[in-house]
């Protein structure tokens, strides 16, 4: 596919009147030749990377419903986010493990880049929206349990 745009951000510079070739979702040329398949009347920019994302448009990564998790991903994709971590808030350890298990297939498929655990190991004096009653000091065996369940998905 050849995409033509009035301008594009490439290597930290704005270039005018560009044609970019994309094959299988990968940019293969920044100076494509040929008739464009798509013309963008604007500026083409790289996708957004969100490393702290709990959800979007009323949907939440901590949901027990996989369809709702997919809606979060779809909403972000439709608005320019190409890479994201699913952030989870402080919960009891068993609930966190279940949330991680639900998110794991989305990580394995590449739909999300990984899982961000925002708690439960936070200072009760700077816990933001987290329930202070659920915060606790890190325990190596608990951390290992979370890492084992996540199978490399915690980022």
Locate predicted features.
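Divalent metal-dependent hydrolysis catalytic cores, especially in the metallo-beta-lactamase
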Residues: 54, 70-99, 111-123, 150-155
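Glycine-rich phosphate-binding loop of ATP-grasp-fold ATP-dependent ligases
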Residues: 125-135
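Alpha-helical scaffolding segments of alpha/beta enzyme cores, especially the outer helices
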Residues: 71, 98-105, 141, 145
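Short, conserved glycine- and acidic-residue-centered signature motifs
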Residues: 62-65, 135-139
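Histidine/acidic residue-rich metal-binding segments in metalloenzymes
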Residues: 33-36, 136-155
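Histidine-rich, glycine-flanked metal-binding segment
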Residues: 1-45
């Amino acid at each position: 596919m050849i995409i033509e745009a009035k301008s594009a951000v490439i290597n930290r510079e704005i270039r005018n009147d560009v044609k970019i070739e994309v094959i299988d979702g990968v940019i293969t040329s920044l100076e494509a030749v040929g008739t464009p398949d798509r013309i963008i009347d604007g500026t083409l920019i790289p996708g957004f990377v969100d490393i702290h994302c709990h959800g979007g448009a009323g949907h939440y990564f901590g949901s027990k419903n996989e369809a709702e998790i997919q809606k979060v991903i779809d909403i972000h994709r439709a608005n320019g986010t190409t890479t994201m971590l699913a952030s989870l808030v402080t919960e009891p350890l068993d609930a966190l493990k279940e949330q991680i298990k639900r998110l794991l297939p989305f990580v394995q498929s590449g739909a999300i880049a990984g899982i961000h655990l925002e708690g439960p190991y936070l200072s009760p004096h700077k816990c933001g929206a987290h329930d202070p009653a659920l915060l606790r000091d890190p325990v190596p065996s608990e951390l290992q349990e979370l890492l084992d369940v996540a199978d490399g998905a915690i980022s």
